[in-house]
C-alpha cells in the first residue's frame, strides 16, 4: 500500500496505516485535492493485504475543521449545478470508500472535528476522543442541509434519531462527554494518551483474523438495508466462508494445544 501521498500524512508500520490531515496551522481543513486523494487511497486499501487496520489521527491539537473556506466554500459559490453535483458525489465517494475498504478504521479525535471532519470520524468503525474534542455537523450554519455525505443515514444509527436531528438542525458542537454517553465515542482519554490508545486498539485488531474482520465490517454496513431474515441468511453464508478459512483451523488447533492463535488473515 502506498504511503507516498501528497495531501495528507501517511505511515504504514506493522500492518497499521496511520494517517492525518496535514495543515495544522489552519486546523487541518480539507481541500478538493485531499478529498480526492483520500477517496482514492481508501479505494486502493480494499485490495491491499499489507494493511490490517487504519488509525486516523489529529494533527496539532485538532482533527479537522472540514472543508476549507477559501479553497472549497468560496469556489463552490461560483459553480454550476452540474459542477456542484460532481463535487458532492465526490465527497460522498470518500465515505463509501471508507466503509467499503474492508479494514477497520479508528478515528482519534482531539480539538475541532467539524463538517467533513466530523463525517470522517462518523464513517470510521471506532472513535476515541480527548475531553477537548468538539464534534460539529455544522452544515446548516453555512446555509446547507444536514444531509451531507451520508450524515442523515449513518449518524442516527450511531447516536439515535433524536440526537442526530438535534446536531444536524442546530449545527452545535457535541462535547466529548456527550459523544461518549451517546455512543459516538468508544472512549475518552487524556490528550497525551490518545494516539497510544488508538494504536493499541488497531494493534489488537491487526493481530486478529483479518479476513473475518473484513466480513464483519461488510455485514455491519450491509445489514441495515436487509430484513431480519435476509441478514441472518447473509451471516450464515459469511460465517460458512470464514469456517473454510485457515484462521478458523489455526484457532481450533491453538485452543486444543492451549496456545494463543496466530492469525494470518486467510
Outline where the language-model segments fall.
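Conserved CoA-thioester-binding segment of acyl-CoA-metabolizing enzymes
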Residues: 1-59, 96
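Terminal low-complexity tails and localization/encapsulation signals of metabolic enzymes
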Residues: 1-6, 253-266
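C-terminal long alpha-helix characteristic of the crotonase
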Residues: 24, 128-133, 185-233, 240-246, ...
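Glycine- (often His-adjacent) and acidic-residue-rich active-site loop
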Residues: 58-96, 143-144, 227
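CoA-thioester-processing core
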Residues: 94-100, 108, 114-168, 182, ...
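Well-ordered beta-strand positions
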Residues: 111, 126, 166, 170-172, ...
Amino acid at each position: 500500500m502506498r504511503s507516498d501521498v501528497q495531501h495528507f500524512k501517511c505511515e504504514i508500520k506493522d500492518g497499521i496505516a496511520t494517517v492525518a490531515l496535514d495543515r495544522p496551522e489552519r486546523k487541518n481543513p480539507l481541500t478538493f485535492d485531499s478529498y480526492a486523494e483520500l477517496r482514492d487511497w481508501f479505494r486502493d486499501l480494499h485490495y491491499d493485504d499489507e494493511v490490517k487496520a487504519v488509525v486516523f489521527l489529529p494533527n496539532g491539537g485538532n482533527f479537522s475543521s472540514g472543508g476549507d473556506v477559501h479553497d472549497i466554500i468560496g469556489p463552490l459559490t461560483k459553480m454550476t449545478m452540474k459542477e456542484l453535483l460532481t463535487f458532492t458525489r465526490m465527497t460522498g465517494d470518500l465515505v463509501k470508500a471508507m466503509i467499503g475498504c474492508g479494514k477497520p478504521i479508528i478515528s482519534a479525535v482531539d480539538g475541532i472535528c467539524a463538517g467533513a471532519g466530523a463525517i470522517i470520524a462518523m464513517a470510521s468503525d471506532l472513535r476515541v476522543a480527548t475531553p477537548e474534542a468538539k464534534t460539529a455537523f455544522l452544515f446548516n450554519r453555512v446555509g446547507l442541509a444536514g444531509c451531507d455525505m451520508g450524515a442523515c443515514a449513518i449518524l442516527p444509527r450511531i447516536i439515535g434519531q433524536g440526537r442526530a436531528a438535534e446536531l444536524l438542525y442546530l449545527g452545535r458542537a457535541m462535547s466529548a462527554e456527550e459523544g461518549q454517553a451517546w455512543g459516538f465515542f468508544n472512549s475518552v482519554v487524556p490528550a497525551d494518551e490518545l494516539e497510544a490508545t488508538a494504536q493499541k486498539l488497531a494493534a489488537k485488531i491487526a493481530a486478529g483474523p483479518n479476513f473475518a474482520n473484513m466480513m464483519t465490517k461488510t455485514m455491519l454496513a450491509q445489514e441495515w438495508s436487509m430484513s431480519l431474515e435476509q441478514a441472518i441468511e447473509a451471516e450464515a453464508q459469511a460465517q460458512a466462508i470464514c469456517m473454510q478459512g485457515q484462521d478458523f483451523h489455526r484457532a481450533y488447533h491453538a485452543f486444543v494445544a492451549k496456545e494463543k492463535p496466530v492469525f494470518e488473515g486467510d
